[in-house]
Curated annotation (Swiss-Prot):
The complex is composed of two ATP-binding proteins (GgtA), two transmembrane proteins (GgtC and GgtD) and a solute-binding protein (GgtB). Residues 4-234 form the ABC transporter domain. Belongs to the ABC transporter superfamily. It is found in: Cell membrane. Part of the ABC transporter complex GgtABCD involved in the uptake of the osmoprotective compounds glucosylglycerol (GG), sucrose and trehalose. Responsible for energy coupling to the transport system. This is Osmoprotective compounds uptake ATP-binding protein GgtA. Its EC number is 7.5.2.-. Keywords: ATP-binding, Cell membrane, Membrane, Nucleotide-binding, Sugar transport, Translocase, Transport. PROSITE patterns: ABC_TRANSPORTER_1 (PS00211), ABC_TRANSPORTER_2 (PS50893). Disruption phenotype: Insertion mutant loses its GG uptake ability, and shows leakage of glucosylglycerol from the cells into the medium. Mutation does not affect salt tolerance. Induction: Transcription increases in cells adapted to higher salt concentrations, whereas transcription is weak in basal medium. InterPro entries: AAA+_ATPase, ABC_transporter-like_ATP-bd, ABC_transporter-like_CS, ABC_transpr_MalK-like, ABC_transpr_MalK/UgpC-like, Mo/tungstate-bd_C_term_dom, NA-bd_OB-fold, OB_MalK-like. Its main location: membrane.
Length: 363
């Protein structure tokens, strides 16, 4: 096991900066997930750690060793890719044993390691099969098993579930999380899927345009996003954003959301007269027919554009009289349809405020 640190790490391809001044400490035994849209720098960061790309500036350490100049084979890591890269002419056993054979390990030690990993992953009965005889989920387990037998200090996983269907992905998420718990080894995982990130990571590093936006626990990312990007990226459906304006009413500073007057929070008042964006998560917008007991309600009149029945909830797409569109997640018992005029209710205790120009959160 080992900790990992990125210290002012930059990776530049000609004029394109893929990773920009990344500073990140990953604890020994932690499950850290890099998440972000395509091209954000998450996979490049993993490849820099693996030694598949060279660092332009800064340094990467595994434990107390600087690894910038070390080849991948000398970094004591194991990597699982999106494409499982199994040798088609080899059996499962031979695929899992291959790296140990190259290292010249004794046959009995290889057998013990392979059988132990196979038992851990529930693939003991597949050891004699070839990859073409396996399902996608089974191939994924073999690829993970091949990494386990090496007993690395750090596991690196680059979108390993992308090739699985939805049901298998749920199962594989649970298996990888359990594997991390059983092995107590550092896992660094890359995905564009926020569900994978939220359900698997001890902490999540959110990236955009090569820059680390926020690294925190799943709960803190969701409840205390550092900026507009994180707020909009984490959560499905995404957070709604409204432009709010300042006004004076009866000698007091207020805010206006499409004509609906709101009190001015102290934190916002301290921010001066800078332009504001208000964030409201879809689950904090309610139909008046079904309201939770403890909220500070505010009416938000709107016209319904579309309703999606999800079974346990309704996803409602609506639009205010001023033309601002938003999404609400409401009780499925509500009888609501397209073109209905509804006075939705929002919980003002669950508002998020952002500096519109700086895009940073105001707490």
């Amino acid at each position: 096991m080992a900790s990992v640190s990125f210290e002012q790490v930059t990776k530049q391809f000609d004029d394109y900066v893929a990773v920009n001044n990344l500073n990140l400490e990953i604890e020994d035994g932690e499950f850290l997930v890099f998440v972000g849209p395509s091209g954000c720098g998450k996979t490049t960061s993993l490849r820099l750690l693996a030694g598949l790309e060279t660092v332009s500036q800064g340094q990467i350490c595994i434990g107390d060793r600087r690894v910038n100049e070390l080849s991948p084979k000398d970094r004591d890591i194991a990597m699982v890719f999106q494409s499982y890269a199994l040798y088609p002419h080899m059996s499962v056993y031979e695929n899992m044993a291959f790296s140990l054979d190259l290292q010249g390990k004794p046959k009995e030690e290889i057998r013990q390691r392979v059988c132990s990993a196979a038992e851990l992953l529930g693939i003991e009965k597949l050891l004699h099969r070839k990859p073409k005889e396996l399902s996608g989920g089974q191939r994924q387990r073999v690829a993970v098993g091949r990494a386990i037998v090496r007993k690395p200090s750090v596991f690196l996983m680059d979108e390993p579930l992308s090739n699985l269907d939805a049901m298998l992905r749920v199962q594989a998420r649970k298996e990888i999380s359990k594997l991390h718990s059983d092995l107590a080894t550092t896992f660094i995982y890359v995905t564009h899927d926020q569900v994978e990130a939220m359900t698997m990571g001890d902490r999540i590093a959110v990236m955009k345009d090569g820059i680390l936006q926020q690294v925190d626990s799943p709960a803190n990312l969701y409840n205390q996003p550092a900026n507009l990007f994180v707020a909009g990226f984490i959560g499905s459906p995404a957070m709604n954003f409204f432009q709010v304006e300042r006004l004076s009413q009866e000698g007091k500073e207020k805010l206006s959301l499409d004509g609906v007057v709101l009190p001015m929070p102290d934190s916002v008042a301290k921010n001066g007269d800078r332009p504001l964006t208000l964030g409201i998560r879809p689950e904090n917008i309610y139909h008046p027919q079904y309201l939770p007991l403890e909220i500070e309600p505010m009416e938000l009149p709107a016209t319904v554009n579309l309703v999606e029945m999800m079974g346990n909830e309704l996803i409602v797409y609506a639009q205010t009289p001023a033309g601002t569109e938003f999404v609400a997640r409401i009780d499925p018992r509500v009888n609501i349809k397209q073109k209905d005029s509804v006075k939705f209710v929002v919980d003002t205790q669950r508002f998020y405020y952002f500096d519109r120009e700086m895009e940073t959160a105001i707490f």
